[in-house]
Amino acid sequence: ILPPQETGLTYNSWFGKFHLEMTWWHLAHYGLWNKPECMEKCFGWFLYAQKLARQIAKRQGFNGIRWMKMTDPSGIEAPSNVGSYLIWQQPHFIYLAELLYRAAKSSAERKELLKKYAGTVNATALFMADFAEYDSIRDRYILRGCIPAQETLKADSTINPPFELSYWHTALQMAEKWRQRSGIDDKGEWDSIINKLSPLAFNEDSLYLAAETAKNTYTDIRFTSDHPALLGALGMMPDSKLINK
């Protein structure tokens, strides 16, 4: 079973190609509606495609696997001057796997889920940890070299988009739990990243910015005319220390 195409069953967008950043919208609710089997149907494709995702990460000099944005049944990354820079699809497999684990009704079922998916969860997180860059001047980790979810910011000048920061923070913690459940002593390998990930940037009016570098978030139409990504930082994602209270 393949992941659903970007627009689901209503329209035939991009000739039916599925865009992995949209997988969460189409599947996550099943984990909360006591229908985890509906969510898990496409996990086999992820296991199949991870070989190609690993090649992408290796080619770019990263550990683990980097999930492609736009693809098809073959798992090959479709060419794009935007899609290849997106990262918000990366944590989805971790998030959905965690929902599966929480929905499991027995220890045997949970053990089987760990057996099937822990390796892919771990490899997904390895890329995320490697992608986070340490800023020695401010003793923090930052995200850059990416196009945020709203697709209106430039990869070469954007630092710390808020939704992606929140998702990194949440998913790395989930991945650590999967390591612990699998009996892996990781010695807190990702703790430093989780604890020192940059907080969400805000302006003098205490309004969150589309990115730390997007100082004119509320005066430049580029930042207010596409995906409301700021809502995802504390809408899709749970509360965290990155949120200014």
Where are these regions (language model features)?
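Conserved functional hotspot residues or short segments at active or partner-binding sites
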Residues: 121
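Long, K/E/R/D-enriched contiguous segments that form extended
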Residues: 2-30
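The feature captures the catalytic groove of carbohydrate-active enzymes
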Residues: 7-16, 62-118, 126-192
